């Protein structure tokens, strides 16, 4: 696996989103707009980001 770290920033609210998208945001450790987390980059995490790509911004560190 890679040693890259990525920063995930929630930029939009989950109001009006599906249950799957809300659960994914919670699993990522986010909850409200402007919350951010730093996690190790891996394929599983990239899949979660793809589900909520319209709600988050991703930066590679």
Swiss-Prot record:
InterPro entries referenced in this protein's UniProt entry, alphabetically: Ribo_uL30_ferredoxin-like_sf, Ribosomal_uL30_bac-type, Ribosomal_uL30_ferredoxin-like
Keywords: Ribonucleoprotein, Ribosomal protein
The keyword ATP-binding is annotated on this UniProt entry: no
GO BP annotations, alphabetical order: translation
Stored Gene3D superfamilies: Ribosomal protein L30, ferredoxin-like fold domain
Cellular component GO terms held in the UniProt record: cytosolic large ribosomal subunit
TM ranges: none
Any matching Pfam family: Ribosomal_L30
Record has Cell inner membrane as a keyword: no
A molecular function GO annotation: structural constituent of ribosome
Domain of life of the native organism: Bacteria
Similarity comment: Belongs to the universal ribosomal protein uL30 family.
PANTHER family associated with the record: LARGE RIBOSOMAL SUBUNIT PROTEIN UL30M (PTHR15892:SF2), MITOCHONDRIAL RIBOSOMAL PROTEIN L30 (PTHR15892)
HAMAP family: Ribosomal_uL30_B
Self-association state and partner proteins as the record states: Part of the 50S ribosomal subunit.
NCBIfam families xrefs: rpmD_bact
Protein name, per record: Large ribosomal subunit protein uL30
UniProt source species: Chlorobium limicola (strain DSM 245 / NBRC 103803 / 6330)
Gene name tied to this protein: rpmD
């Amino acid at each position: 696996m890679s040693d890259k770290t990525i920063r995930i920033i929630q930029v939009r609210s989950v109001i009006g989103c599906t249950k799957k998208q809300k659960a994914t945001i919670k699993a990522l450790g986010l909850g409200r707009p402007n919350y951010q987390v730093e996690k190790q980059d891996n394929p599983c995490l990239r899949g979660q980001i793809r589900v909520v790509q319209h709600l988050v911004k991703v930066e590679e560190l």
